[in-house]
Amino acid sequence: VQIQVTGRHVKVTDDVRDYIHSKAHKLPRFYDRIHDIEVVLDHESEQFTAEMIVRVDRKHTFVARETGPDTFALIDLVVEKLGRQLTKHKEKNRNHKHDDKSDYVSEG
């Protein structure tokens, strides 16, 4: 999985970058067709904003955004949100691909 980390109005330290990579590498557990992950950290008026964009199957994009004072906590929250979104997407795909044929009973 390709992970790109960008900072707007803030320098992304190696500790933060390593933390993002360790958390982002857990996302394929929720959905294994992740193409790439983009993380944008922004600092504005005493608040940080963490935005994570996950592209899957080359046609679906999932975005999670959080704002707060602690960068590490924001990353945790964003990864948690994306985990829920990816799980929901996976379940949705699973349910659409397999129609339940048990409702159709052949009478003979």
Where are these regions (language model features)?
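N-terminal, polar/charged subdomain of small-to-medium soluble alpha/beta proteins
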Residues: 1-108
